[in-house]
Amino acid sequence: MSSTYHGNLSISIFGQSHAPAIGVTIDGLPAGERIDMEELGHFLARRAPGQNRLCTPRKEADVPEIVCGAVDGVTCGAPLTAMIRNTNTRSQDYDTLRDVPRPGHADYTAQIKYGGAQDVSGGGHFSGRLTAPLCIAGGICLQLLRQEGIEIFARIVSIAGITDGAPCAAAVSGKPFPVVTDEIGEQMQQAILAAKADGDSVGGVVECVVTGCPAGLGEPMFGGMENRIAQLVFAIPAVKGVEFGAGFAAAAMRGSENNDAFCMENGEIRTATNNCGGILGGITNGMPIVFRAAFKPTPSIRREQRSVSLSRMEECTLSVPGRHDPCIVPRAVPCVEAAAAIAVYDALLEARKYQKTARD
C-alpha cells in the first residue's frame, strides 16, 4: 500500500481501524524543536470520535504517544514515530462486509487489488480512523509554522446544501461546530440529525485559509503548491474535490473579472482581490492561501442499498451495521488543516534549501 508521503518530509502512516494501534513516522523534522504535547492533544481532540450525537458513537481517547524521535519533548533528528492505541473496536459488525461490499466505500476495490487479504474490520487501512495519525503529523507542522508567523484555520462552508457564505475567520476553528454564522450552523446540524434518523448521511464543504505565508513557496508544473496541498487533502477519505481561490466559479468569469490586480499596501505588493487563492504558477504570492475541499456523504448507512455477493456473484441488498458518522464534515475540519500544514511546512523546508544553495 502507498501510505507514505515523499517530500522534504517523509511521512508514513501505519495501522488499521481495528488494529491494536495506528500511528505515523515522520522523517526530516529539524532537530531541537519542542513539541507541545498538550496542544497536540487538543488538536487531535477536535477530530476524535464519540463527542456528540452528530458523529459516530465509537469513543476513542486518541492520546498520542511519542515512541521515538524526541527526547524530553524535543526532536532529536531521528525519525519521529507516534502512535494512538485503538481501545473501542467491534470487528464483528463487519463480518457481512467480507462478502457484500458497501456501495461508495473501498470494500470492492480493495478486494480486487488485494485479493481478500485486506483487513475489512472498520474499513481497515481505508478507514477515516487513519486521519488521526495524519493529524499528529499536521499538528506538529502547525506548531512549527506558528513559530514562522504562519497560521492555518478551516471552517465548514456547507453541509447538505446549506451554505454559510460569511468570510472565514481564525476564531472559527475553536468552535465545537466550526461555522462563522451560528444560526446557519444550527440548520446544518439539524440536517445531519435528520439524515441520521433516516439511516442516511450527508456531505459538505470545508474551507481552509493559510495566512502569513511568504511569497515564493512552491514550484511550477508538478511541484506547485496546489499540487502539494491537493495531494495531501486527497489522503483524507471522502474528499472528492479540491478548488483554490475562485475555483470552478472562475470558469464563468471574464479575465478582467478573475485577474487579481496588483497594488501597494504598507509598502508591500499585494492583490486587490484573491481569486487565485494566493497561488500563481504553482508559487505563493504572499496573499492568503484559500482552498475548499468537498466531502461526499458517509457511505456506511443503515438505509438499505443494492450490492452484490462476491461469493455467489449475484445481486443482493445491504444495510450497513456498526457505528458510523452521519456526516464526516465537522470532524474533517482539523484534518484539512493538518494536510495544509504538512504541505506548507514541507514547501518551507524546500525554500530554505534553495536559499542555502544560493548563499553557498
Task: Outline where the language-model segments fall.
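Generic N-terminal targeting/processing segments that precede catalytic cores or assembly contacts
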Residues: 1-360
